Amino acid sequence: MRSHSVVCIGELLIDFFCTDVDVDLMEGRQFLKSAGGAPANVSAAIAKLGGDAAFSGKVGKDPFGYFLKRTLDAVHVDTSMLVMDEKAPTTLAFVSLKQNGERDFVFNRGADALFTLEDIDQEKLNEAKILHFGSATALLSDPFCSAYLRLMSIAKDNGQFISFDPNYREDLWRGRVSEFVSVAKKAIAVSDFVKVSDEELEIISGVKDHEKGVAILHEIGANIVAVTLGKSGTLLSNGKDREIIPSIPVTSIDSTGAGDAFVGAALYQLANTDQIQSVDADFVKLREIVAFANKVGALVCTKIGAIDALPSLDEIGVSL
């Protein structure tokens, strides 16, 4: 890896989307298999833009695990830190959507839950310019949670730039929201760049007002905060300056992976920033970074899928 690379650490899994109309999983018969996992999506977004991205995580040494590795390899993500477990299966998620918006969700957790510090190539991690922690599953339980927080602490001690996206999933944290808030705050405390949705901001900060919520995240320890607001754009703050950066109008077909695309686009630019540790003081630069990330996130919504919908730099130029 080169010194301007980004390593994304977390889960890589299979999403099975039920393509039958208005049925629950018990009645569903047809499913579309797709590569998933927020950190993996971020690594793919960076690579498709032409950046250097690596993924670190664990899958099963099974057909699904090989499919996932091949998917990341195809978009030129470095998978040399992807561990394939011979005993645990690849994590699988099954989702169906009814016309009333009700979601049926089953999560079969596998190899990603067993990710430990022993699975990490610390020497390679130390070479990275940015470490991104954006797992929806890492904070759920040990050993993954302890490994995640420990890696963030090591990166902080090394002076590396730390990115964090809590990726709250109600289906996974039902009945354990206070536990989610507690571990998310531990991660935010050591993070340089924190991306949250407006829902996540309210859950973590405990307040509905966006500006007050952002101030709380800064008090916890975040240097740069980006709150995605959907069509309204992104609220950007560095603790001193604060502004809503507008998005671009698009006809949305599928918003899957839009948040991950936003993060990937932001990290792609941050990785190419010379003075990254002081970038939080340059609000003009931050504004440019978020404006570009907004565009990438919006463009992803115009296509089906997560990784397949991610644009290249050339495609962004044509679209805009």
UniProtKB/Swiss-Prot annotation:
GO MF annotations in UniProt: kinase activity
Uppermost EC category: transferase
Keywords assigned: Kinase, Transferase
InterPro entries hit by this protein: Carboh/pur_kinase_PfkB_CS, PfkB_Carbo_kinase, PfkB_dom, Ribokinase-like
UniProt key word Hydrolase: no
EC number, as in UniProt: 2.7.1.-
UniProt keyword Ligase, yes or no: no
Domain of life: Bacteria
PANTHER family on file: HEXOKINASE FAMILY MEMBER, PUTATIVE-RELATED
Annotated family: Belongs to the carbohydrate kinase PfkB family.
Annotated protein name in UniProt: Uncharacterized sugar kinase YdjE
Organism (species): Bacillus subtilis (strain 168)
Lineage: Bacteria, Bacillati, Bacillota, Bacilli, Bacillales
